[in-house]
């Protein structure tokens, strides 16, 4: 089994969907490792637009079997809604090619209610969550009181555990805008419908042990990782390479490539430090030209220049074997393009390849930039590297050199599926 892992290298929304879609055409197995319906990416396949949240995007490939792994949290209504949407758009057999680990956890509507209450209590220190209940669900998992997908099948156990969760949150917050008995009633239907999808993950992988090409689809990104990201402004799961190996019980020696997906500039949704953010006309231009609105929340993304300090840190943790640089065309109309090359701390310390753990300290750093000349010409839809303007190639090659020679193998030049350069 050869395993390819696709990971976000910044704060998410890098455009992982397109490379995942492309690689899934050769994959026989596609897996989601972590996260839930807080993730979101869009794929345009045969002129049809698909929005993915919890489902693996390998479903667009008719020969690809898909797994939602043990490290995920699954909002069951969203699972069925998303599956129905795919089937309505022509993927009629999608339901026969998707499975869920019985060890994945259930994200309830209760968790979404609690998410909103917890954010409200934080006031001006809000994390900026998607409000989907992901954090409270992972909190319940860590506290050993969560409900696993497999436990839905035992009606008595399921109802006891959900009522216990509800009682615990009611004791903490008071009366909630949530009816536990109503949710229990809905799961009487979901229980029957889930039966064909739920599997023992290890037995599933043994069944597909001869799969020549397995694709692991990362959600969110390294800088949102619970351990390595800009804590506490992170998601609640392990979004890096280590998290994928753990969640899917992967054999590390079978990993053949780790692809880091990086935007040609930087974006972030929600709260938290963002050293290269541009609160000026450059940030506004990146936001408007790049159509930077979240797939899941519709929120406006914060925008800034490409950050080498961040990407060196990301590379050191995820060990990318190749990069996919996306949305190069968004930079077409800039006279000059800046790249963050160092952070200077308040005491004068200069950082180039380490990332402070202290979120408050990150808010205080000064950023050193280099300026590179823009290319002021259209790269939309370019499919050959040699057809790019010289300054666009120079920008890409500068990033390669500064990231220690990790090759930029794929370059996104537009929204369409074939707007991609593949460098051999």
Curated annotation (Swiss-Prot):
InterPro entries: Adenylosuccin_syn_GTP-bd, Adenylosuccin_syn_Lys_AS, Adenylosuccinate_synth_dom1, Adenylosuccinate_synth_dom2, Adenylosuccinate_synth_dom3, Adenylosuccinate_synthetase, P-loop_NTPase. Substrate binds at residues 295-301. Binds 1 Mg(2+) ion per subunit. The active site is at residues 13, 41. This is Adenylosuccinate synthetase. GO terms for cellular component: cytoplasm. Plays an important role in the de novo pathway and in the salvage pathway of purine nucleotide biosynthesis. Catalyzes the first committed step in the biosynthesis of AMP from IMP.
């Amino acid at each position: 089994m050869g395993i390819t892992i696709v990971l976000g290298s910044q704060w998410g929304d890098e455009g992982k969907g397109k490379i995942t879609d492309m690689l899934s055409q050769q994959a026989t197995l596609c897996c989601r490792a972590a996260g839930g319906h807080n993730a979101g990416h869009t794929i345009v396949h045969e002129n049809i637009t698909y929005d993915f949240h919890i489902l693996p995007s390998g479903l667009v490939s008719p020969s690809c079997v898909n797994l939602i792994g043990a490290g995920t949290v699954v909002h069951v209504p969203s699972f069925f809604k998303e599956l129905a949407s795919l089937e309505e758009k022509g993927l009629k057999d999608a339901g026969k090619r998707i499975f869920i680990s019985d060890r994945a956890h259930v994200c309830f509507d209760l968790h979404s209610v609690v998410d909103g209450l917890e954010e409200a209590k934080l006031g001006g220190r809000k994390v900026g969550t998607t409000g989907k209940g992901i954090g409270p669900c992972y909190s319940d998992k860590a506290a050993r009181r969560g409900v696993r997908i497999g436990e839905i099948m035992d009606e008595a156990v399921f109802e006891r555990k959900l009522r216990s969760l509800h009682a615990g949150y009611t004791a903490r917050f008071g009366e909630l805008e949530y009816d536990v008995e109503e949710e229990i009633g809905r799961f009487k239907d979901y229980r029957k419908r889930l039966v064909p999808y739920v599997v023992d993950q290890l037995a599933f992988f043994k069944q597909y042990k001869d799969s020549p090409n397995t694709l692991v689809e990362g959600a969110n990104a390294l800088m949102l990782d619970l351990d390595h990201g800009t804590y506490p402004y992170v998601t609640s799961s392990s979004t890096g390479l280590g998290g994928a190996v753990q969640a899917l019980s992967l054999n590390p020696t079978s990993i053949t490539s780790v692809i880091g997906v990086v935007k040609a500039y930087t974006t972030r949704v929600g709260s938290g430090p963002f050293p290269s953010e541009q609160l000026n006309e450059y940030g506004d231009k990146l936001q408007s030209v790049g159509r930077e609105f979240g797939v899941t929340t519709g929120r406006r993304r914060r925008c800034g220049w490409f950050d080498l300090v961040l990407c060196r840190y990301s590379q050191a943790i995820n060990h990318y074997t190749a990069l996919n640089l996306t949305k190069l065309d968004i930079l077409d109309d800039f006279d000059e393009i800046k790249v963050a090359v160092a952070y200077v701390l308040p005491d004068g310390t200069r950082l180039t390849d380490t990332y402070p753990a202290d979120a408050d300290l990150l808010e205080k750093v000064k950023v050193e930039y280099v300026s590179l000349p823009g290319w002021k010409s259209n790269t939309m839809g370019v499919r050959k590297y040699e057809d790019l303007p010289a300054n666009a190639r120079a920008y890409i090659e500068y990033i390669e050199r500064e990231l220690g020679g990790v090759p930029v193998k794929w370059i996104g030049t537009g929204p369409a599926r074939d707007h991609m350069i593949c460098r051999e």
